[in-house]
Regions:
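A structural "domain/chain start" motif
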Residues: 296-342
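Bacterial N-terminal signal peptides
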Residues: 6-18
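Lipolytic serine-hydrolase domain surface
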Residues: 217-302
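A short, hydrophobic beta-strand-centered structural micro-motif
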Residues: 308-312, 355-382
Length: 429
């Protein structure tokens, strides 16, 4: 498949290559798609996701198009190439974050959906109300968002959506993953339906949404439910999934996957950062959280540098954060591996105080040039609901145990979860 224009060389945190294998690891795939959906936004975690891992090999193609009545459609086309030349493709649609997005959400009239070319899409959309009996009907704002993003601007006679469809038809063994949060998830569903109308096989279209509303009526569901794979991830306490069915007569379809936010998460359950945190926890629960590389196994890390030795990570937190301790250690180890693949990890011995002399001896044994010591501390803030101040301390020693540098950074959870705060603090170092 061809890469679209105006490539932005960004990168995404620890995306597992084998998440897109012929038989994908579902927890890894869901983490990839959650991270991609968050990376499509702006904000601290989104910037962190976009800033991490050129070595992971992802190129992100960003597009933004103004469509009908000022609707702004946006998407990111993420492409990664394997060593054998095979390409992995993912389309992520941002959710609501701009004034134009709010206008899109509020345009809740129903519009007809169908056609087999962009011009037909518009003609069907404008079908008079009295002639729409038995037709698939969808949310007008979501429809215009999808139309603007993929089926408005034509380059060399084809819109972005038409090029995607042509490439997929020409390569029937390839798959396209579409994802998004809230409004972005609604756009992903409609985009898959449009690509299906352009002749793309159901086996090639895989959609995952996070906290997305229903997009169409019973006729839409009946027409498209077997024409692509749809997984709907729903967070407990997220009200958006129930916003549209009653007033517009819309229906959900596809496989529903229920998640629950971590107890230490203070953010509103609809927030995409809550979904990212839950996806990462499930990934660690599936794989060995005591080892690094949990979602980089088998990948070449282009950030390998001089050999360093990472001592057991010391974590001293309030009892309220006790359940998070293994996740905090695991995500910090993975972040260090992403920074330097030549890192040698000490056995995860957390009993007793850290013996710097003994650890320096172990560092020399493995030929490390330097030794890293990390300490995570955290305490709950008074009179604040599940809000914590986390501190990440880092000390660097030479191979003989002499201190070379030390520093500490701290941040408060809230918009970010405890795991995400540790990643954020690590990135500031």
């Amino acid at each position: 498949m061809k890469v679209l224009h105006f490539v932005i060389l960004l990168c995404v945190l620890v995306f597992p290559l084998r998440a897109f294998a012929a038989t994908p690891d579902l927890p890894a795939l869901l983490f990839v798609e959650a991270a991609a959906s968050e990376a499509a936004y702006s904000g601290e975690l989104s910037e962190l996701l976009r800033a991490r891992l050129t070595a992971a090999g992802w190129e992100i193609v960003g597009a933004e198009t103004v469509g009908h009545r000022g609707t702004v459609g946006r998407f990111f086309h993420m492409v990664r190439r394997d060593a054998d030349g095979a390409e992995l493709h993912l389309i992520a649609f941002p959710g609501t974050e701009r004034g134009s997005d709010v206008w899109t959400d509020l345009r809740m009239k129903r519009a007809a959906f169908g056609g087999h070319a962009p011009a037909e899409f518009l003609a069907v959309r404008d079908t008079p109300k009295e002639e729409r009996g038995g037709m698939p009907l969808v949310h007008r704002g979501f429809l215009d968002y999808c139309q603007a993003a993929l089926f408005t601007d034509a380059a060399e006679g084809e819109t972005a959506g038409e090029r995607l469809a042509a490439d997929l038809r020409a390569h029937p063994s390839e798959k396209l993953y579409l994802t998004g949060h809230s409004l972005g998830g609604a756009a992903a569903i409609l985009a898959a339906a449009r690509l299906s109308d352009l002749g793309v096989s159901p086996d090639q279209l895989i959609v995952t949404t996070f906290g997305a509303p229903a997009v169409g009526n019973e006729d839409f569901v009946r027409t498209y439910q077997d024409r692509f794979t749809l997984r709907r991830v729903v967070m407990r306490g997220d009200p958006v999934k129930d916003v549209l069915p009653s007033p517009l007569g819309f229906h959900h379809f596809g496989e529903r996957i229920d998640w629950q936010p971590a107890r230490t998460t203070a953010a509103f359950p609809h927030t995409m950062t809550v979904y990212v945190d839950a996806a990462l926890r499930r990934l660690y629960d599936t794989h060995d959280s005591s080892g690094a590389l949990t979602f980089l196994v088998g990948q070449e890390n282009r950030t390998a540098g001089h050999t360093v030795y990472l001592t057991p990570i010391v974590v001293e937190v309030d009892d309220a954060l006790a359940e998070d301790v293994p996740y905090l250690r695991a995500v910090l180890r993975d972040a260090q591996y992403v920074r330097n693949a030549a890192t040698v990890f000490a056995p995860a011995d957390t009993s007793g105080p850290l013996d710097v002399t003994a650890q320096a001896r172990a560092a020399r044994t493995v030929g490390a040039e330097q030794m890293l010591v990390y300490r995570i501390s955290g305490e709950k803030l008074r009179d604040a609901h599940e809000t914590y101040r986390l501190t990440l301390e880092r000390s660097v020693y030479d191979r003989d145990g002499n201190l070379l540098a030390a520093g500490a950074r701290s941040a408060v959870t809230g918009a970010l979860t405890p795991m995400e705060v540790i990643l954020y603090l690590f990135a500031q170092d």
